[in-house]
Design a protein with these regions (language model features):
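Catalytic core of membrane glycerolipid acyltransferases/transacylases, capturing the structured
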Residues: 75-135, 161-166
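A conditional alpha-helix N-cap/helix-loop micro-motif detector
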Residues: 59-63, 86, 112, 132-136, ...
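Active-site metal-coordination segments of metallo-dependent hydrolases
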Residues: 7-13, 112-113, 173-176
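Membrane-anchoring hydrophobic helices of lipid-metabolizing enzymes
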Residues: 1-83, 118
Length: 253
């Protein structure tokens, strides 16, 4: 992946995205981030083949903020988990379900029609059984899951055509307002979650403190403010280890 990655079509998108993140003149830093990104991408791809082993043995995964997770389980009330495509992001939902969270995850199918069935099978079998396909039907399905006491997990770091243009690393990026909409409508906490890969390819999942939402937040302005806050959290997560985020998406299109 380190050799092939720079040759693919999205390399220009990656460079443009990194220009927004660190500026157009720091070429050495850009190359370092790209090298780490492709290396992590390759490792994550290989790890898909071993998701069953990760499911059976989580000794390589630690959780920071487990008390927050235990409190969520104890309260037995749905929450909205939000994150991005960091390190091996699939392991976050896997660990949430392993710990006893009733969870449904919103996903975007891969553009590769040959690879997508395999990925969906692996996710349903070893990561999280309840998968919701992104889209209008997926929103309705999410509401049904919430009414059945399921928490919802979704990635909010990618561009969504139906989103709002909101600040993200100094530019304006189409951003999903779905977490804010669901949280304010059903009075649910929003819980950011992050995963880091260390040099030994062990992982630490961090459960952030819940963001409390009240009924006074259920208007359009407050939903936008809440979404901007979530964007800032994603920015902070990316900045912790830029090489472990996927820079190939045209986030600012």
């Amino acid at each position: 992946f380190n050799k092939i990655g720079p040759l693919i079509k999205s390399n220009q998108i990656i460079n443009d995205n990194l220009d927004k993140f660190i500026g157009p003149y720091n070429e050495n830093k850009k190359e370092e981030i790209k090298f780490k990104m492709w290396k992590n991408f390759g490792k994550t791809f290989v790890e898909y083949l071993f998701l069953k082993k990760f499911r059976e043995n989580n000794s390589h995964i630690k959780i920071k903020g487990e008390n927050t997770l235990l409190k969520i389980i104890d309260e037995n009330k749905p929450v909205i988990f939000v994150s991005g495509h960091f390190a091996n992001f699939e392991l976050m939902s896997m660990e949430l379900t392993r710990k006893g969270i009733k969870l449904a995850t919103i996903y975007r199918p891969l553009n590769n029609y040959f690879l997508n069935p395999f990925m969906e099978h692996m996710r349903r079998t070893y990561v999280c059984r309840d998968q919701i396909k992104k889209g209008l039907a997926g929103v309705r399905e999410s509401i049904n899951y919430i009414k059945n006491n399921f928490s919802i997990a979704l990635m909010i770091d990618q561009r969504v055509s139906e989103g709002k243009r909101l600040p993200f690393f100094g530019g304006m990026a189409l951003t999903s307002t779905l977490p804010a909409q669901l949280a304010t409508k059903y009075q649910l906490d929003i819980v950011p979650i992050y995963i880091a890969r260390d040099k030994n390819d062990d992982f630490e999942i961090e459960i952030y403190e819940p963001i409390k939402v009240s009924d006074v937040d259920n208007n359009e302005i407050n939903k936008i403010d809440l979404t901007i806050k979530l964007n800032k959290i994603i920015e902070q997560m990316i900045s912790r280890e830029p090489g472990h985020w996927i820079w190939t998406h045209n986030r600012w299109k």
